[in-house]
Swiss-Prot record:
Substrate binds at residues 36, 60, 82, 139. This is Shikimate kinase. Mg(2+) binds at residue 18. Pathway: Metabolic intermediate biosynthesis; chorismate biosynthesis; chorismate from D-erythrose 4-phosphate and phosphoenolpyruvate: step 5/7. ATP binds at residues 14-19, 120, 156. It comes from the Bacteria. Its EC number is 2.7.1.71. The gene is aroK. Belongs to the shikimate kinase family. Catalyzes the specific phosphorylation of the 3-hydroxyl group of shikimic acid using ATP as a cosubstrate. Pfam families: SKI. Keywords: Amino-acid biosynthesis, Aromatic amino acid biosynthesis, ATP-binding, Cytoplasm, Kinase, Magnesium, Metal-binding, Nucleotide-binding, Transferase.
Amino acid sequence: MSKRDNLYLVGLMGAGKTTVGRLLAKHYGCTFYDSDHEIEARTGVKIPVIFEIEGEAGFRRREEAVIAELTTLSGIVLATGGGAVLSPANREHLRTNGLVIYLRGSPEQLCERTRNDRNRPLLQTGNPLAKLRELYQQRDPIYRELADVTVDTARQSVAGMTRVLYGKLDLLKGEATSFDPAG
């Protein structure tokens, strides 16, 4: 399997990984997966329930297993959970088996996008913005180190982000003739 067969989206919650991932999959004729949705489908419960019963560590174990499995596939676009990059094993799977795209948004922007979303256990706190700032400070260096491509989501529409991504991916395609997300 070529490193260029798959596209993996990373970034904090609310960055647009699922939305942009679906568009990339459609554009390139790939199958789309969302690691959080896969976990929910396999367990039959929502992510907050897993956090409540198993804690974050239990959820991360499930996430690691799903990512290990999905990264063996070819011709996919995968939207990962925001904390997936905390696992060295996940980082290795992503780095080795595809192109990693970091959708980078400011904590303030992401807080605005997620303010009414109750399906994000880490933000069910008295100060979600402070939590997002903490997560950004912790994870941004990891995302940047892992990413082959970074797109700033600030003040960009989804259409604008995807246009930027298509351009960047087309440039990579020119540099690496093996790039073919559709397999």
